[in-house]
């Protein structure tokens, strides 16, 4: 990773140690990051986390590897499913840097800036901020600004990472959010031309075990019992810490080819699609992205001890009115949905071949 100087922020004290802006970073058990020089070598930290919490992280490919590598060479827009708040983009950056010597620019929502050190950490990295939670007019202006910035990066052949949706899919039913795609394609050109200019290359992220599964199930019951329930800032921080520290088993990042040839073939066969309402055009592209991601899942076989694993996660959930039957089903659902979506994508592929 490359870290950049932040203007008007005092990072070092007189003894060349980090200021109090970074005191909360100890929550991540990285108290040895005492100086900026230490901070600049955060990549080894990602390796340490990988060794301690996984049985290996593998970079895999779906389809023509040479074509995927050509897409990367010319700058790719990596769009992934969203499993972990911190590590999805961090480990992808590590894998791409080790294999291809590139570092994608990373989009992150400002809703995660619960503490000052998180914002500073983000701005040190090759990150840009996706502003959320504003009024309708401000949201539109923010989207236009973001779209222009992304187009600028793409015009320079830079690679970019963004999750397919705002927030993680609690039930692991990974579907691209049309509003995210719309935000990326604001401009004077035709919608499909804007999508093609992005050069979207979907990436599938699969964890054998999700360390945040019990937290997600807990949130689903809280939301069920009180539809007005909203996460607090500290809930996201707790998810970050659990996601980083928790055991994940095997982890696979699978790169898939650019969706551009598929879009171009679709428009050749159906030129009338350019005249469809915007929400229909968005859904057509979202469906293509989803199929790529679903096809790229690594499907792990579950052994006889999986039921015991689910019960152990259920035991970690603390709620005053704990609905064990509901929570157990939500936990099973998280691990069932990727396999179901993978099978649906395979069926679609076989039907349309």
Description of each model-found segment:
Residues 77-79, 107, 129, 161-163:
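Structural motif
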Residues 87-89, 115-118, 171-172, 211:
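Short helix/loop capping segments that flank catalytic or ligand/cofactor-binding pockets
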Residues 96-104:
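A short alpha->loop->secondary-structure connector
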Residues 1-76, 82-93, 97, 119, ...:
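Membrane-anchoring hydrophobic helices of lipid-metabolizing enzymes
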Residues 105-133, 140:
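Conserved nucleotide-cofactor-binding alpha/beta core module
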Residues 83-85, 113-114, 135-138, 168-169:
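Glycine-/small-residue-rich active-site loops that bind phosphorylated ligands and cofactors
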Residues 51-55, 106, 137-141:
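Short, flexible loop segments at the rims of nucleotide/cofactor-binding pockets, characterized by
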Residues 138-353:
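Non-catalytic C-terminal accessory region of glycerolipid acyltransferases
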């Amino acid at each position: 990773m490359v870290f950049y100087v932040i203007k008007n922020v005092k990072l070092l004290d007189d003894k060349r140690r980090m200021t109090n802006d970074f005191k909360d970073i100890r929550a991540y058990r990285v108290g040895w990051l005492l100086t900026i020089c230490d901070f600049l070598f955060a990549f080894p930290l990602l390796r340490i986390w990988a060794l301690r919490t996984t049985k290996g992280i593998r970079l895999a490919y779906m389809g023509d590897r040479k074509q995927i590598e050509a897409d990367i060479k010319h700058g790719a827009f990596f769009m992934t499913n969203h499993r972990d708040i911190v590590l999805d983009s961090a480990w992808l950056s590590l894998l791409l840097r080790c294999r291809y010597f590139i570092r994608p620019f990373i989009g992150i929502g400002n809703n995660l800036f619960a503490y000052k050190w998180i914002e500073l950490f983000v701005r040190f990295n090759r990150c840009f901020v996706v502003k959320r939670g504003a009024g309708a007019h401000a949201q539109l202006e923010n989207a236009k600004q973001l779209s222009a910035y992304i187009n600028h990066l793409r015009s320079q052949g830079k690679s970019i990472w963004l999750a397919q949706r705002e927030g993680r899919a609690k039930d692991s039913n990974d579907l691209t959010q049309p509003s995210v795609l719309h935000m990326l394609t604001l401009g004077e050109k035709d919608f499909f031309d804007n999508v093609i200019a992005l050069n979207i290359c979907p990436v599938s992220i699969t964890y054998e075990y999700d360390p945040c599964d019990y937290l997600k199930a807990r949130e689903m019951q809280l939301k069920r019992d009180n539809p007005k329930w909203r996460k607090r800032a500290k809930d996201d921080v707790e998810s970050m810490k659990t996601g980083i520290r928790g055991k994940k088993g095997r982890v696979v990042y699978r790169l898939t080819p650019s969706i551009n040839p598929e879009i171009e073939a679709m428009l050749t066969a159906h030129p009338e699609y350019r005249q469809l309402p915007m929400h229909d055009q968005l859904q057509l592209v979202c469906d293509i992205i989803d199929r790529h991601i679903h096809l790229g899942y690594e499907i792990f076989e579950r052994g006889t001890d999986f039921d015991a694993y689910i019960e152990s996660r259920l035991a970690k959930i603390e709620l005053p009115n704990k609905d064990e039957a509901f929570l157990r089903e939500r936990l099973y659902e998280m691990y069932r949905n990727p396999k179901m979506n993978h099978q649906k994508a395979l069926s679609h592929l076989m039907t349309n071949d």
